[in-house]
């Protein structure tokens, strides 16, 4: 037999036919029962604890990522961006009532490995976004891509709607379109 069959024969001390059945997921001619995933309760959402200032976030976004100060200040003032106690950028996503429902964190460390993640319990449909007044929606994978785009194309940026999917989910885009049916032009600005 092959390597796997020989291994099963030796490890389980089975004859060849039974080793093959075991590898096929059967025992004594019956299918083995598939293990059920452990039931886990969904985690409740909580924003990361903010730090007392935003020096590292501003330094990182302005000097390392070259985002315009006006753009960073706008999102900070709107309470959509802040620095957590671990000095990460926290990008906040709000629901229709203005309540935080999503947070994406990204390290400000420019050396070594980059750390980014969505906070447990985040509602993926409420990712980091900005609603505008015109009919266009710009879609990005990451919040920093969104901020970079605004920096590169500043003309009329406050009129446009933007959403960062904070990954690859389509849910944030569908939610923006549901919330604002007048949006009729979607620009996919994806890597």
Question: Locations of the language-model features?
Answer:
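Non-catalytic accessory segments of DNA primases and related replication-initiation nucleases
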Residues: 1-62
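Helix N-cap/coil-helix junction residues
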Residues: 14, 66-67, 137
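Short, basic/aromatic recognition patches
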Residues: 67-84
């Amino acid at each position: 037999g092959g390597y796997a069959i020989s291994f099963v024969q030796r490890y389980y001390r089975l004859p060849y036919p039974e080793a093959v059945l075991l590898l096929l997921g059967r025992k004594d001619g019956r299918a083995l029962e598939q293990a059920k995933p452990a039931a886990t309760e969904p985690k409740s959402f909580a924003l990361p604890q903010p730090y007392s200032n935003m020096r590292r976030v501003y330094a990182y976004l302005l000097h390392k990522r070259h985002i315009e100060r006006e753009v960073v200040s706008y999102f900070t003032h709107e309470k959509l961006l802040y620095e957590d106690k671990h000095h990460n950028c926290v990008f906040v996503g709000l629901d229709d009532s203005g309540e935080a429902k999503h947070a994406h964190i990204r390290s400000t460390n420019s050396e070594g490995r980059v750390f980014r993640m969505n906070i447990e319990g985040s509602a993926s449909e409420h990712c980091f976004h900005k609603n505008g007044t015109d009919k266009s929606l710009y879609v990005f994978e990451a919040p920093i891509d969104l901020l970079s785009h605004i920096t590169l194309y500043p003309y009329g940026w406050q009129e446009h709607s933007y959403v960062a999917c904070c990954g690859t989910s389509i849910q944030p885009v569908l939610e923006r379109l549901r919330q604002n049916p007048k949006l009729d032009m979607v620009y996919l600005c994806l890597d």
